[in-house]
Structures are given as structure tokens and as C-alpha cells.
Amino acid sequence: MRTHSNDQDWVVSWHHSTEKPTGRAHGAAGVCLTHPGELVLISHDGDHWGLPACRPEGNEQPEETLVREMLEEACALVTGYRLLGSSRSLCIEGHERGLVLVRSYWRAEVMVQPYAPRFEVRHRRPIPAAQALNVVRDPDRAGTRVALRALREAGIC
């Protein structure tokens, strides 16, 4: 699927967990589920709700990025995880033309901690997992489609 972000055009694709797409590691995203079956979402603006995700620090492995970022962005302690797949974004027009970014998506069992917003994330919202299709919305249409695919792979919808 095509998208436009930061004055650049991208082609975004989904890859199953058995595939290893090539490109620069661009972080990890978590479909975070609590024991009572709630899905933990975050928002920067209070209007668009999505999966916690961010870039790796140093030489982190994707699993390490997942665990760190879920705690930092959603104040959620990861107790278990399973790789769902990856998104691969190829810049086809713009100053980063040719750049390929790969982000891993994980199903993560979490224990929600008291919320203390830090960094750019201002809102956290646990919702019944069954409501995910009605709530998950990224400002970017391709981002929403990838998040919904991750939810399907996680068995949410």
C-alpha cells in the first residue's frame, strides 16, 4: 500500500513472522494484552489511538526494544511475547529515496503499571479487546491498516 509521510512517498507491506524482510531496523510495536483481556493503546493527541511502538536504542534486539518501549510508552510490563510479523516501508520518492525501514510487531502479554506519561506519549487507554476495530486509528491510513493486520495476526479481530 502507498502512503505519504514527511513529504515523502512510501510503499508499505506486511510480512508474516516466518519471513525476514531486509532493511534498517525501525523498532518494535506491541499488541499489548492484559490478563482480563484488555488491549492497551496509546495516543499522542487524544484523538488517534494506536499500538505502542518506537525505534531501537543502540544495538538492541527487537525483543529488547519491545520490552523497553512498552514500559516507557504504555507503562506496561511485558511478561510474554510472540512475533506476529513485520512491516516493510520503502521510500520511493523524497530525500530518503531507496531507504527501507522494517518494524516488528508482537503480541505481548502485559501487566499495566500506574501511568506516568513521559516523552511524547500523553495518553494511555486500556479497552476491551473486542472494541479494537472501532478505536484503533493512526493519522496515516497505511499505519492503521498495518495495525489492524497485527491485531488480526494476534487473534484480536
Give, region by region, the residue ranges found by the protein language model.
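Short connector loops at helix/strand junctions that flank enzyme active sites
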Residues: 25-27, 44-46, 51, 78, ...
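Conserved Nudix-box catalytic region and its N-terminal flanking loop in Nudix hydrolases
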Residues: 33-73
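Unchanged
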Residues: 56-142
